[in-house]
A protein has these predicted regions:
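Short hydrophobic/aromatic-enriched beta-strand-loop microsegments
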Residues: 58-64, 104-108
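Short beta-alpha junction loops
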Residues: 42-47, 88-91, 111
């Protein structure tokens, strides 16, 4: 993703979208080259904490005890960047971003623009039918 200079962008990932990346540490390292702040946002705080610890990610923000909508709103208010970009998967992610003043970018588009590899699981199991296949 070729964004503005690093002092102008806050980049947030929805946890499910971030799990789609094949090499999460490389995504964070690359994003830091052109973003001032990089972090994860999701409603399930325990899942975020576990994922961050498992992958030893060094992030600037996490959702805390807030839901996704409130986290987006508060992070936007506290970060002094011109641009706030939220990478997500669902229509709910898009709605949350747009209603809190963030730009929404689908994970596939972000990966393509930035050259970030997605897991095979992401492409094979995207959408409703993919989730059904996961059950069996």
């Amino acid at each position: 993703m070729n964004g503005p200079t690093g002092t102008e962008t806050t980049l947030g990932f929805e946890l499910a979208a971030f799990k789609a990346f094949d090499r999460p540490n490389e995504v964070v390292a690359d994003a830091r080259t052109w973003s001032r702040y990089v972090g994860l946002i999701a409603t399930d705080t325990d899942a975020v904490t576990s994922y961050v610890q498992t992958h030893e990610l060094n992030l600037d923000f996490l959702p805390g005890d807030r839901d996704k909508w409130l986290a987006l709103q508060e992070i936007r208010e506290k970060t002094n960047t011109d641009r706030h970009v939220f990478v997500g998967l669902s229509s709910d992610d898009r709605m949350a971003a747009e209603h809190t003043g963030w730009e929404f970018v689908p994970v596939e588009e972000a990966a393509e623009k930035a050259g970030w590899a997605l897991t095979d699981h992401t492409t094979r199991n995207s959408g409703f039918l993919g989730r059904i296949r996961d059950w069996f």
